[in-house]
Amino acid sequence: MDFYARQAAARTQSRWLVLALAASIAVVVAVLTWMMTAVSAFRSGDYLLHIRRSSVAEFAATHPQVVISWALLWTAIILLASLSKSLMLRGGGGDVARSLGGTRVERDTRDPRLRRLRNVVEEMSIASGVPMPEVWVLEHESGINAFAAGHNPANAAIAVTRGAVATLRRDELQGVIGHEFSHILNGDMRLNIRLMGALFGLMMIGGIGKTIIRMSGASDSRRGGAFLILAGALVVLGYLGLALGRIIQAAVSRDRERLADASSVQFTRNPNGLKGALLAIAGVPGSSTIVAADREDIAHMLFASGMQRWFATHPSFEERVRALDPSFVAGRLPQLAEKRVQSSNQDDEDDLLAESNQIEMLTKPATASLTAGAPRAATASLPIDPVGIALQVGRPQTAHLDQARQHRLALPVELRQFTDSSGQARCWLLAQLISRDATVRGRQLDMLSEALGQSERAAVELVLPVAARLDNFLRLPAVLQLFPGLRRLARAERETLLGLIERLILADGRIDLFEFCLGKLVNLSLRDELGARTAQGSDNLQSAAGDIAVLFAVIAQQGNSDAVEARRAYEAGISRVLPMERAAYTVSSNWAAALAPALTRLQNLQPFAKRALIEGLVVTIAHDGQLTLPEAELLRTVCATLQCPLPPILPAVPIDEALQFTLGE
């Protein structure tokens, strides 16, 4: 199943889940309404304490306003409780991690094990094309577990327990993080965080019952006894509804966990890493336990489940290990777990030594990296298989992971050692937009002073020399690593930053592709993070024909200096997407202003329509037989806007600009 099929299946599954939860809530509300109607009948004085079912029905028939009022009241209580929980989690995955006692892992951490965790997450981020998520460690959790949370990749966070950080080797940690990244890529986080809100609403019913019990427990009156009976019924109903919701939740979660395991192995090409992590947990009963008070809220998010049978949110360890190793025999689980412990110690020590050496290198000047020399443009050979490129979306491979490690190690020392503070991240981002032309640069720095103050201008000027040395291949990957710091900006600061970015880009009266891509990615991340927006995926290709024409025209124009060849490239690609009817080739003089809103509207395409669109874009780009860095960056930006993250499609090491390669057939 490819990324688009998984997205379509996830949407279908989400709809069924919403219907199932709505049915559960409706049943709970119906029973609650009947109970409270009975209480109203009793309190009216028309009936004795022992109320027959027919009497309640008669009362309901003659007092419909009472029934409606109780139904609306209980529905409102559940929905408002769910809404309040959702609003509490609006900040995304970081809020979930913080609620469990998590601590943010900073870029400049000196703990080798946390440094290793951070490195693994950074590499996965670069390889998958997903903005760098926040990284958290649950310091007080000795069990081995992890989770990814957030509304979308723009506000995602990955949290790992201290037990996992202390116990797992690098390859095992990679397997776990790959598993969590698959949840980010497949849209599981959004469903999980919505589930937290819905289940909280059902839990609130039981909470109301407990409150009534505490308030009425001391009363010996008949009224007090009646209230205790009512409160007990509320507790039972609330938790029965919650149990039903958790059964639904667990059934959905188990399928998602199987898919995440498979995606992790596809990502790392090392089933032994994920297998080792599972054996580390299976070898010690209860070793995946989370002790935080809110652990039940996130049970469906965890890498390993602590719940059993009907409520198990994960397949059994035996089933998960057997999927990775068909020769596995369930009875050998304890022996394999013990063997894993005995073989891991020396490997782990060697691995930690390598991570420690990287920490020491942070304080030394870079000697040879991709930052040496002036930035370069490049072209590359790329087997042009539009279907193959489109299928890479959401499916990073081992080669992408290896390339990501090269990119991470090639980043400037100054960038690698800076902390995730919002101020430093903002400085590095703005430095990427400062022109080399002295006149334009002076104008931009004046804009910066006006918007952020003289001290911020001085901070940006301080990092300008390093930013100027940054190789073109590394500019956007470096920007993606800044997002955890940028997310710490307050709402007003983000709006100021986004406005300043727009002014800096327009300072020279033109927009190049890098500037457009940077501006779009930052807008996409910060604005989506603020609004927690996600595309609905309901439009087909025909309904979006106008926006598709704008996109293909810009891609063709930017990749071909000759107008005739640009038109041919446009026709070659768009005919694959809209074979029957399509707009003629026209390019707006202000291509960036036309493209930005078109991309925003195209987010709402159906998953399989997005696949066809990406295939057509690759055909247009490949028309001249070359893939340039600006074209590759624009394609990845388009894919990111469509919420279809594309792994790197150019080699990690820059190709000398004098060399030209012919794209494969």
What are these regions (language model features)?
Residues M1-A149, A166, N186, L191-A250, ...:
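Hydrophobic or amphipathic, alpha-helical segments that drive membrane association/targeting
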Residues Y4-A8, G225-A250, R269-R503, E515-V619, ...:
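Cytosolic-facing loops and C-terminal tails of multi-pass membrane proteins
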Residues V121, V160, G175-H183, G187, ...:
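Active-site recognition of the HExxH zinc-binding catalytic motif
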Residues P133, A154-A156, D297-A299:
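Envelope-exposed proteins and targeting segments
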Residues E141, I158, G163, R169-G175, ...:
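Membrane-embedded segments
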Residues R169-L185, L498, E502-A507:
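Short alpha-helix carrying the canonical HExxH Zn2+-binding catalytic motif
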Residues H179-E180, A260, S316, L504-G509, ...:
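DG-centered beta-turn motif at the end of beta-strands
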